[in-house]
């Protein structure tokens, strides 16, 4: 028999699938598995909640990982555009296992205190420069995978974030040129062990990078699909209750400024992921603080990008 948490997750997924499929104006790139495939493939999600076009079946010469796909640049994207225009048969969503849209990137870069309203809830000043930290790529899991509570932490918290995916190698990128280096956007959950985040001189890495602490997906939405990435509703629900609700227009440093800043220090590569910060409503600043527990279900949703749903185990 299914446990209550598993039943709730399946129920939520069915509700998402029953929503009207939002027409795909452009590309929603995914990595997926299916029973008839021997290995993961790259595909196109046919709108939020829709089925999947198998790009590797459409063109067997295409790479089967998103990082390699992005490394091909315009050559790979042009194939995807042709597949989109061809209105190919879809693999039903019920037959697909969605992976994170990007796995094993060279870097996962994160930004702290990057929402004005998040700074307000902590009663701290808006940073003068971006606060940068990282997660290891081993923390990445798919949009519907479980979040594993580590026995080492008693204070695991939620953070919905918009993630930017790099599409082209670059260093010392000017803010005015940044979007030429961006492939697109996706939904991220910056799961955070607050007790470990505050230890070791407040070096955040250990508290941010436990296995399964970076669910991503469901799709890499190409930049030309989004009219304005800095004016999107962003929210998080825990067991159906809204705990975070804001808009990406509250970001202190926009995508262009963040990437220009980071690229002063490191070379960015195709597939690199930049989490752009979280809005207010995280558990640690509630009175009393609230943290995730086994059986909880977390939904992170961003307008036009989609929703990821992760059970806590």
From Swiss-Prot:
Requires a divalent metal cation for activity. GO terms for biological process: oxaloacetate metabolic process. Its main location: mitochondrion. Residues 1-84 form a transit peptide. GO terms for cellular component: mitochondrion. Keywords: Acetylation, Isomerase, Magnesium, Metal-binding, Mitochondrion, Transit peptide. The modification N6-succinyllysine is found at residue 202. It is found in: Mitochondrion. The modification N6-acetyllysine is found at residues 202, 233. Mg(2+) binds at residues 159, 161, 190. One of its GO terms (molecular function) is metal ion binding. Its EC number is 5.3.2.2. Transmembrane segments: none annotated. PANTHER family: FUMARYLACETOACETATE HYDROLASE DOMAIN-CONTAINING PROTEIN 2A, FUMARYLACETOACETATE HYDROLASE DOMAIN-CONTAINING PROTEIN 2A-RELATED. Belongs to the FAH family. This is Oxaloacetate tautomerase Fahd2a, mitochondrial. It comes from Rattus norvegicus (Rat).
